[in-house]
């Protein structure tokens, strides 16, 4: 009788032991972390359609309940990107910025990150926004952009052209992560946040090196920051202390500032920069048409709590982008970012950029 050859170690499975779902789920459901390569194996099974819906659901929920490590989430994101369609960066580069949140905060606010992205682009910083339709709220970023007249179904080359020509592009997640459809269907059926909520902000197909990344869970925001730190990104991972996955104007926010491979935790109070306290009800959104109307109003110069929150988040993204330069100072960067965000709206530049972006996508 011949002896089977020994299992060889690989980059995905450095221990050499063949992972199984029983092994992985057994560890997660007893609160144990996974060995290097095991998370990557599980995600590859999911992305290739090999995993069953029951296995996907059990993995997604138990990983979040266990609380994933940055190393585990890095493996999830890396495998997801391995299967993704990528936005070509030979022309637009990677000194771009994303403004996106995990969702799952249950607040159903207007699409602050979508409006802020337009303001940032109007301020002269190239934006590649990664987003999707609503999962738990009434309207996601994709829904609102579509209601504004944008074509959201663009492919990699077309998104790159938008960034090159207009200064902003939207990468609609299903177009770039077709292999994620297996997990996406299960995620919608489960209806509660899972570890997969963390992956959208970590898998932008244009690999922007800067970002304002909102996280609805304070304990997982630090995990996300750790992933960005391994990439050498300049990112502000933010969690409103009212629970929002944005920089909030209702109270303070906690910021994990990622720069040059390090993570620094800070408390940020918008009142220090002259912002009035808002009530979360003043930031509440509606369906896509309602949120599109709010966006048109803010970009058209309407004052009030929604504008304040948009300016604050746009400034945060500009601060993150400034952090790509090692000599960026915190307070001066905020002062500059706030001034640029306000001017982008008040000068009409943001409103004009949206109109130009819509026209450009319709002509592609």
UniProtKB/Swiss-Prot annotation:
Gene3D superfamilies: Nucleoside phosphorylase/phosphoribosyltransferase catalytic domain (3.40.1030.10), Transferase, Pyrimidine Nucleoside Phosphorylase, Chain C (1.20.970.10)
Record-listed Mg(2+) 1 binding positions: 113, 246
Cofactor remark: Binds 2 magnesium ions per monomer.
Binding site for anthranilate 2: 187
Residues reported in the UniProt entry to bind 5-phospho-alpha-D-ribose 1-diphosphate: 101, 104-105, 109, 111-114, 129-137, 141
Enzyme Commission numbers on file: 2.4.2.18
Annotated keywords: Amino-acid biosynthesis, Aromatic amino acid biosynthesis, Glycosyltransferase, Magnesium, Metal-binding, Transferase, Tryptophan biosynthesis
Binding site for Mg(2+) 2: 245-246
GO cellular component, one term: cytosol
Job of this protein: Catalyzes the transfer of the phosphoribosyl group of 5-phosphorylribose-1-pyrophosphate (PRPP) to anthranilate to yield N-(5'-phosphoribosyl)-anthranilate (PRA).
Designated name of the protein: Anthranilate phosphoribosyltransferase
Species this chain originates from: Mycolicibacterium vanbaalenii (strain DSM 7251 / JCM 13017 / BCRC 16820 / KCTC 9966 / NRRL B-24157 / PYR-1)
Taxonomic lineage: Bacteria, Bacillati, Actinomycetota, Actinomycetes, Mycobacteriales
